């Protein structure tokens, strides 16, 4: 529900400026999300396309699942599992219910990312 003002009118924001950082490491691609407004799965696929890297080592940041429906969370979890992500550090706009589901689904590969978190690339 984000909007931009164009020619004096409010229009849905297409979020062209949504940003993420992609790092190619020896362990695979590391994706650092801002808020993933365009979708965490879309961001991962875009990272793979831009870098040519298939293996995903880590996804870190906000997944924008806080206000997502249960169906959307379930679909996102299934897609995330298909990437065989080794480390998933959720925070910010992921929300506690979705974070709990990610923790249950990813087990030891999941952590609550916060200020001061460290990860070896």
Identify what each model region corresponds to.
Residues 1-10, 15-21:
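Anionic-ligand binding region
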Residues 14-20, 24-115:
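Cap/insert and terminal regions of metallo-dependent hydrolase folds
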Residues 116-121:
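A short acidic, often aromatic-flanked loop/helix-cap motif at beta-alpha or helix-coil junctions
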């Amino acid at each position: 529900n984000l909007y931009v003002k164009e020619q004096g009118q409010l229009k849905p924001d297409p979020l062209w400026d949504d940003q993420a950082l992609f790092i190619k490491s020896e362990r695979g691609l590391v994706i650092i999300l801002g808020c993933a407004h365009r979708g965490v799965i879309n961001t991962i696929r875009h990272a793979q396309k831009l870098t040519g890297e298939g293996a995903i080592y880590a996804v870190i940041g906000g997944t924008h699942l806080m206000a997502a429906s249960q169906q959307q969370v379930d679909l996102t979890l299934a897609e995330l599992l298909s990437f065989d992500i080794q480390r998933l550090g959720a925070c910010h706009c992921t929300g506690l219910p979705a974070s709990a589901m990610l923790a249950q689904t990813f087990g030891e590969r999941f952590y609550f990312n916060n200020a001061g978190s460290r990860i070896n690339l």
